Amino acid sequence: TVRPQLVGPLTLLLGAKAEQGSPEGFTPLDRLDDFVKAYQQVLAELAARGVQWVQLDEPGLTVDRDIPNAKIAELARKTYSALAAETNRPAILVTSPYGNLRENLPALLDTGIEALHLDLVSTLYNAEALTAFKDSGVTLVAGAINGRNIWRADLRALLHALQNINGGAVAVASSTSLQHVPHDLDLEDPADVP
């Protein structure tokens, strides 16, 4: 099964810079509505081609910005509510590697997306945050395997910790993209490899 992976619209715009000569006060986030429409079209095209799931990566929602967190959370709620409201689309998995979603977590759980990834390696979430998944109907994709070192993991301890999550459906994943994983273990420090 193919699951296309795209940079999420908020991360794309949060990382963009206004072109020189742009109107005074313009920020790339001012174009969010246009981007949401474009993403809706892409999702519809993917659905028409039989794609069942799409992954939208939103690491931009886990880092500190000059914009208040509450404002970003409201943009996340608005963006993903609009994307999830489309009936002709694949199921949506939003990933949040490299940090804590903070205010964005309840905002995203309230949008209608099907799954939300949390990086459980680089940040801690309290039990209340994890329990919120149960009431939302959103699948928790637990980023519990260190994406930068997948070779070292205490799977028994991990299984025990995941069994204690008082939430709904849980899937296990790496905490981050696997782009940092070496292609050849022979080149790695033996201390990092089991």
Predicted regions and their residues:
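Domain-level signal for soluble alpha/beta catalytic cores
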Residues: T1-P194
